C-alpha cells in the first residue's frame, strides 16, 4: 500500500475492464513470481488458494485470461510501470544509487516460431531468443530498469545504453558511475557518457593485438603488487577511436601456466585509486548473481514471442524481486542477505488457515514453522502496525491482516 499500488497499475495504461480489475491481475502475476511459479500456466496447478484470495479472487484466474491481460500491455506501458515502480522503491530505500551495473542477458527460445537469433552465451551456438538489458544498483544488487528487444544488427552499445541510462538517471539523479562489460567499450558511447551525461565509467577492454602490445609496452618497474593476489597492476593514458581526449587504461599482468598474460580496463575516473576501480569492476558480477537468483522468479520463462507480453511480464518479475528486497530490508538481520528463493522457503512457504473475522483477515499458522519464521513475521507485522502500513486492503473488503501462531 505504501508503494501506491493503484498509481502503479494505472501506469500500465490499461482501460478499465468489466469484471476482473487490472489491479487484481497484476497482483496475481506478482504473487505467482514470488512463490516460484515461473509461467502463468502454473497458476492453475496451485492447490492452496491463498494467492488467489490475497488478490481478491475466490479462485485462480485461468492461464488464458492472464495471457489476454498481458496482451493489453504495450512495451512502452510495461517500461513505464518499471519506471514508476522504481521511483516508488527508491523511496523505500532499496537503492543506493551511486554506482550502476549494466549488462545484457540472452533469453533463449526453444519453440518453433521464427524469431531473431543471437549467440547463446554458454552453448556457443546461434539460436532464437530475446535480448534483455538490465541496470542494477551495485551496492544493493537490486534491479532498477530493464529493456527487451529482438536480436538484430541495428542493436548497438550506443543505442541500447544511452536511452537506458537516461531513464536510470531520471530514477536515480545521484548516479555517478556505470560499470559494464567489454561489449560496451565503444568510443562513441563512452564519449556521450563522459561529455553529455557527466558520468564516470569502467569497462573491460577488448583484447585486440594492438591493445596487448600497448599493455606490454608499460615498463616493468611501473607495475606494483595488486594487494590480495599474485598479480601486478599499472596504468597509463590511452585513446580510443571516436572518443575525444584521453582516458585511463588500467593494466593487470599475471602468469598462467608460466605464460605472461594481461587484461585491462578503460575508465575516465582519475580520482579513485586503481585498486578501488578494480574492486568496483569486480562487483559487476552481482548482476550475474542477479540473473541466477531470478531463475526462481522465472525471468527466462518467455510468456510468448510477442515483445509486449515479454515486456509486461518482465516488469512484473522485476517488481516481484524488489518487493522481496523491501521485505528483506524490513526483516533485517540474516534475512537481508537471503535470495528470493530462500525468503520464500523461510518466510512464505508455510501452510496457514485464512479466515475473515469482521474487519480482519486472520492468518493462522499451525505448527511446522521455525521459531525464526515466527519471530521475523511478528516483527514485520509489528512494524506495519506502528507505521500505519497495515492499512485496510480495499480489494479484500477493507480488512486488515492479523497473524496467529498455534
Set out the residue ranges of the language-model regions.
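Basic, short loop/linker segments at the boundary and entry of helix-turn-helix/winged-helix-like folds
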Residues: 1-30
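Short, conserved catalytic/metal-binding motifs centered on acidic residues
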Residues: 28, 43-46, 62, 66, ...
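DNA-recognition alpha helix
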Residues: 40-55
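Short amphipathic alpha-helical "interface-anchor" segments enriched in bulky aromatics
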Residues: 43, 273-307, 312, 316, ...
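A short, flexible helix-boundary coil/loop motif
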Residues: 50, 226-236, 320-406
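Active-site-proximal, Lys/Arg-enriched surface segment
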Residues: 63-136
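Electropositive, glycine- and tryptophan-enriched low-complexity nucleic-acid-binding patches
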Residues: 122-173
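An anionic, glycine-rich sequence signature occurring as long contiguous blocks
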Residues: 198-295, 352, 379-406
